[in-house]
Structure formats: C-alpha cells, structure tokens
Amino acid sequence: MKTPFLRVKNVVSVSALCAASLIYATSGYADDQRHDDENSDRPITVAVTGDWPYNKLLLDNAHLLVDSVNADTAVSRLIHVGDIHAGSMPCTSADILPPIPQSNPGYNQKIYYQFQQFAKPVIYTPGDNEWTDCQKTKQFKSGAPLNELASVRSQFFAKPGLTLGKETEVLSQSRHFDPTYPTDAQFVENVMWKQGKVVFATLNVPGSNNDTLPWAGTFANQTAQDKEVSERTGADLRWLEAAFKKAKKEHARAVVIGIQADMWDPAAITATSNELSNYTPIVQKLADLVEDFGGPVLLLNGDSHVYGADQPLTNSSSATGSIHHTQAVPNLTRITVQGSTTAPAEWLRLTIDPRKLQPFSWENVAYCADPAISCE
C-alpha cells in the first residue's frame, strides 16, 4: 500500500529573501517594543491555501489537505485566499430558475462541508471564479455575478463575525463599519482579528482586474458593475485603514493581509492592455499604510497558482515596483500560494514570531503529488 504523499520544502524567511533591504525600524516601531507582553509574544503558526479545490481529484481527496492541516498541532487557523473551483468549472446559477443547464447548484455546499472538517478556525475570502467570472463563456455563463456573490455570502458567511471550521470570533465589516458609509455593511466577508502581537485582515479583492473586465452577454450591466466595483473597493480601502489603525492602537508588531488577486501578475500586462490597472488605488493605499506603520507587513494572495515570494515595492523602479506608481516600501513582503493543479499541491505553513525583527518564516507542505493526475 502506498503511503500518503507528504513532504515539506522551501523553508524560507524574510531575511533569506532579502538580507539587507529589510533592516528597518522606525522610532515608532521601536517604541512599540517596550509594550511587549510576554504571554502574547509567542510565535503564531497559520496554514494558508487558495485556488482549492480546483478539480474533481482535489475535491474527492479533500481529506488529504484537511488531515495534513489538522495533524499540525502548531497551526492555529487556516486562511483560504479564494477560488474554490477552477475558472473552467461552472457556478451555481444562484436565484435563476430554472437553473442554467450547465450550472452546478450544489457545489458551494460541498465546499462548505469540506471547510467544516477542519479542526481549526477557517477564514475564507472569495475569489473571482466563484462570483466575478461566472458570466464568462469558459464558466458556461452559469451565473450572474451579484447573485453568485450573494449566494457565497449566504453559504459561507451566514454567521457574521464567526469563522468557518472551529467557530471563533472575528471582527466583520458588516458589524464594524463607518456609519458614514452604510453600504460597507454588506461586506460580511471582510474580517479582521488579532493574535498576540499580530493583526490579520482579509479583503474581497478579486481577479479580473478587480472585477472591471466587462460582464458579458445576458449578464452585461455596466451600471450595476460600476456600482459593485466602487462600493467594494471603497469598503476595502476603509477596512485596510481600520486594520492598520488597530495595529497601531494595540501595539501590534506585524500585520498580515489576505486577498485573492495577484495585483502584480506579469501575465496580466501585455503590449496592448493592462489588466492590473484597477488595483492601483488598493496598492497605493497599502503602500501608504505600510510605510506609516513602519513594522513588517505580509500580503498573502492566490490567483496566479504558482508559489512565489517577493518584496514587490522595495524598488519603485523595478518590474513590480513600477506597475502601481508607489513610493519604495521595503517592509512589505508578499507570498503567492501554490494552487490550482500545479504540482505538487501544497499548503503554506506560515509562522510569525513577533520577537524577531524579521518575524515571517514559512515552508510549503505538500499533500498531493500531482493534482492533475494522481495524489499518490
């Protein structure tokens, strides 16, 4: 009998990623170190995944990921950065009767069931494949974007302020929003929490150029799409500000942000088009907040399917630094998690040690040899 495929690789730290460029510490950040609480300075370990499950094989073998994460007693939570099925798989035809023939009405319930098998709190932020892109031909025109987003919210966020998996309290924007912007209350999926000296937040930032690629066919509705993008992006920016405000107020030593979109995906820029342009307001706001915070910040994303780690804003004239026209921000690190059917299928084991100047270290844990062929 073959043993389950499990291996650990790519043990990485920020200092290994870039030794000298991240030696920074503003006076405000240094002052925060005087507020250390011995009981809350312990290292924090979380699991991160995304673009999962991306095919029938991964769904049928979901227990491999669940069991691998559950077996790690150090892991305190799981963060899923969106896309619960492939971009070539159908959506649910939510609120459309009779259902679109090529749709899969019960799919989200299957994923919800798998999330509930984790013995850890599960924090999930939606990806474009489960709502934004449902109107595309490659997804069989199997759902209206806003209907699908509403369905995702009703399935995965039915209890605002509570995680999936092992129920644990988090702050949801639906309950903690600026009353000046009442439409922010709809974003139940944007959540925030603090563990020890680390503030975490998730934002609904999908692919498809932040949902600005035109909805097609019978689902075309430019007015509704523009309203969606405007309200969600505004809410995201305010939630991002709230996360850093919380981090400074509570003397956090690090901040971790989770989104779906790869806002620096080189494949999205060609000689004739720039499908990253509508992330610029988010990246510029992030750059300003990270610079002001002064401490280490980690951005987690999926979307482009292949593991990678970089510091995208360290050099404002570099390939990544020049895309969104920000100042140089050396204290931002970014990790793209392995996903889709990229072999091997892996989850990211992230450890944050607030006692260290460079607190982030991580390793990839493989649980399926080749998700396009076989997990054995």
Regions found by a protein language model. Give the residues of each.
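Active-site neighborhood of phospho(di)ester-bond hydrolases with catalytic His/Asp-centered motifs
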Residues: 48-50, 77-83, 121-127, 258-259, ...
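His/acidic metal-ligating clusters that form di-metal
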Residues: 39, 68-77, 194, 201, ...
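N-terminal signal peptide c-region/cleavage motif recognized by signal peptidases
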Residues: 20, 25-27
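A short C-terminal boundary segment appended to hydrolase-like catalytic domains
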Residues: 347-376
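Extended active-site neighborhood of metal-dependent phosphoesterases/phosphodiesterases
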Residues: 95-232, 314-354
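Bacterial N-terminal signal peptides that target proteins for export
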Residues: 2-15
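N-terminal active-site segment of His-dependent metallophosphoesterases
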Residues: 31-104, 252
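Active-site environment of divalent metal-dependent phosphoester hydrolases
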Residues: 55-56, 86-89, 126-135, 208-213, ...
